[in-house]
């Protein structure tokens, strides 16, 4: 499959697309923000970067198990992060955090709808020009390639349709709206192309693999490149390639300690799940778990093809490859059937594997990292001055290169704005308005007042999670993950009140942070007095719109 010509205004292969005839002095001036650690000395090629992003792939429940080739080709050849988190356990806010390097309260994407700023005109106007790919393209001279799922509302007619190509992308091969495997439409540099249900030409994961390999043949050899490949797997509808549809027949969702138990002393939304689950519900989630793994086998093939092609072209040793997911997932934990959105480790913790120049093989890092760090890291690799950005994240490059005596964060923020229906669900008349994502047995995965903010703390002394809900209770959940890794026991009422106050203080500071102030929660003020009702401005409004004032 051949790529269509570049999007309007992009130059073709065969000459550098940035200042093809400028003097060396002028080139240094234009790329001055990207000199960094690599420089632009004669004969020096700045590294290439590939970012592989899956959809809903967990880390806690064994989501990396099917990807044997990926673990061998990326993880074993580089570094695996064992404590990688997302700032929101939902596709669009998390992907926006990757692109901008910002927490949701700073990029203002709060859910998967246009009203929640997902690929809205406001997002396009305010955030897209400042994403790290836009900086790579405009300031660092990288050719940039995107293939796959962008944001859940991308292609919506009210936000420019498929003709809209975000700033910063030289090659654009994006899926309309949410993940599918067949019968979808792609925007190819702003032109729509429909795909059907013929496996050999339409299976999306394979299409992304083919067009990515094509880019490596088609690209300019005068510029470094950045590739972002965002697969549909393992997102529903969990359609595996034909050759993998019988794989993992003896695999079941993990029966860990928090599987199919009541969410005692948790937020009401978790407590409402019916325990024990019915046999039919367990069969359904076991089947979903199995199919998710099946879809990932095609991702494993994609990774292998990509690495082999980079090796064949002689570019592998000068290329950083990142592999991660936009959020985790659950299958029966606390009797919640299947979804993400919740504050627990299974939903907010993701795989993160990196290989590249200067990274020793078979490394594991326990440092607390988040997907807001990906943009700063990639810009740092390109040599861009991070002080010129307003990103909340930190560059992982010192960790990747084995820096010693490194000063690093101890806290990351997780925040989520719940969604609910305005009317009673006709299939569940016993439920009041305000819930959503409900299953036939009326177990719901979300609600308006499932709005929460958490601080996840990892240090030499603590391995804690502290969360507050924006509801009438101002409900608090606290977990000691050293003693209770499955987060079964909420210790909010038994923990030392002084420590509780410190965690609340850190959370308040992170929720009001921006840029550099997000990288540390600051020094605890001994005069601070704990009052959880200060966390949210509307003090328990059930149908909260805490972020809406920022949408322009």
From Swiss-Prot:
Assigned GO CC terms: azurophil granule; azurophil granule lumen; extracellular exosome; extracellular region; ficolin-1-rich granule lumen; lysosomal lumen
Subcellular location(s) per record: Lysosome
Catalytic activity: Hydrolysis of the 6-sulfate groups of the N-acetyl-D-glucosamine 6-sulfate units of heparan sulfate and keratan sulfate
Biological process according to GO: glycosaminoglycan catabolic process; heparan sulfate proteoglycan catabolic process; keratan sulfate proteoglycan catabolic process
pH and activity: Optimum pH is 4.8.
Residue numbers carrying Phosphoserine: 541
Binding positions for Ca(2+) per the UniProt entry: 55-56, 91, 326-327
Post-translational events: The form A (78 kDa) is processed by internal peptidase cleavage to a 32 kDa N-terminal species (form B) and a 48 kDa C-terminal species.
Domain of life: Eukaryota
Top-level EC class as recorded in UniProt: hydrolase
CDD domains: G6S
Leader sequence residues: 1-36
UniProt EC number: 3.1.6.14
Keywords recorded for this protein, A-Z: Calcium, Disease variant, Glycoprotein, Hydrolase, Lysosome, Metal-binding, Mucopolysaccharidosis, Phosphoprotein, Signal
InterPro entries: Alkaline_phosphatase_core_sf, GlcNAc_6-SO4ase, Sulfatase_CS, Sulfatase_N
Glycosylation sites: 111, 117, 183, 198, 210, 279, 317, 362, 387, 405, 422, 449, 480
Positions of the catalytic residues: 91 (nucleophile)
Disease: Mucopolysaccharidosis 3D: A form of mucopolysaccharidosis type 3, an autosomal recessive lysosomal storage disease due to impaired degradation of heparan sulfate. MPS3 is characterized by severe central nervous system degeneration, but only mild somatic disease. Onset of clinical features usually occurs between 2 and 6 years; severe neurologic degeneration occurs in most patients between 6 and 10 years of age, and death occurs typically during the second or third decade of life.
Similarity comment: Belongs to the sulfatase family.
Protein known as: N-acetylglucosamine-6-sulfatase
């Amino acid at each position: 499959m051949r790529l269509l010509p570049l999007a309007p205004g992009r130059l073709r292969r065969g000459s550098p697309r940035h200042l093809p005839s400028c003097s060396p002095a002028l080139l240094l001036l234009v790329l001055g923000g990207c000199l960094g650690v690599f420089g632009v000395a004669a004969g020096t090629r700045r590294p290439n970067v590939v970012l592989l992003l899956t959809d809903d792939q967990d880390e806690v429940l064994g989501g990396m198990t099917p990807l044997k080739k990926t673990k061998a080709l990326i993880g074993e050849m580089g570094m695996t992060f064992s404590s990688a988190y997302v700032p929101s356990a939902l596709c669009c806010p998390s992907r926006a955090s990757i692109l901008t390097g910002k927490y949701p309260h700073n990029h203002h994407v709060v859910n998967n709808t246009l009203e929640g700023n997902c690929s809205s005109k406001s997002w396009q106007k305010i955030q897209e020009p400042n994403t790290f790919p836009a900086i790579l393209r405009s300031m660092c001279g990288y050719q940039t390639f995107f293939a796959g799922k962008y944001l859940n509302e991308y292609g919506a007619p009210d936000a420019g349709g498929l003709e809209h190509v975000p700033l910063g992308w030289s090659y654009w091969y994006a899926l309309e709206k949410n993940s599918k495997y067949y019968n979808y439409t792609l925007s190819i540099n702003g032109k729509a192309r429909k795909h059907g249900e013929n496996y050999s030409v339409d299976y999306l994961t394979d299409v992304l693999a083919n067009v990515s390999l094509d880019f490596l043949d088609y690209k300019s050899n005068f510029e470094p490149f950045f590739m972002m490949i965002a697969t549909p797997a393992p997102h529903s509808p969990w359609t595996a390639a034909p050759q993998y549809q019988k794989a993992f027949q003896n695999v079941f969702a993990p029966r860990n300690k928090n599987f199919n138990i009541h969410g005692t002393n948790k937020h009401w939304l978790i407590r409402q799940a019916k325990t024990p689950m019915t046999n039919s519900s367990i069969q359904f989630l076991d089947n979903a778990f199995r199919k998710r793994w099946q879809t990932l086998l095609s991702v494993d093939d994609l990774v292998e093809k990509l690495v082999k092609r980079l090796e064949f072209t002689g570019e592998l040793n000068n290329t950083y490859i990142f592999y991660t997911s936009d959020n985790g997932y659950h299958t029966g934990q606390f009797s919640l059937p299947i979804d993400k959105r919740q504050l627990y480790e299974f939903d907010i913790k993701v795989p993160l594997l990196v290989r590249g120049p200067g990274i020793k093989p078979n490394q594991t890092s326990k440092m607390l990292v988040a997907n807001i760090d990906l943009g700063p890291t990639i810009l740092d690799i390109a040599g861009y001055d991070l002080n010129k950005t307003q990103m909340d994240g930190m560059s992982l490059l010192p960790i990747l290169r084995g820096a010693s005596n490194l000063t690093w964060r101890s806290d990351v923020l997780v925040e989520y704005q719940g969604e609910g229906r305005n009317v009673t669900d006709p299939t569940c008349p016993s439920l009041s308005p305000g819930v959503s994502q409900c299953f036939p047995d009326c177990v719901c995965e979300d609600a308006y007042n499932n709005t929460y903010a958490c601080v996840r703390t990892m240090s030499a002394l603590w391995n804690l999670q502290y969360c507050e809900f924006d509801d009438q209770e101002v409900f608090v959940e606290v977990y000691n993950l050293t003693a209770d890794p499955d987060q079964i026991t909420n210790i909010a009422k038994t923990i030392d009140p002084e420590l509780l106050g410190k965690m609340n203080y850190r959370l308040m500071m992170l929720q009001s942070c921006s840029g550099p102030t997000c990288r540390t929660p600051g020094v605890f003020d001994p005069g601070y007095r704990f009052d959880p009702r200060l966390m949210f401005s509307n003090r328990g409004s059930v149908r909260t719109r805490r972020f809406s004032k920022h949408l322009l």
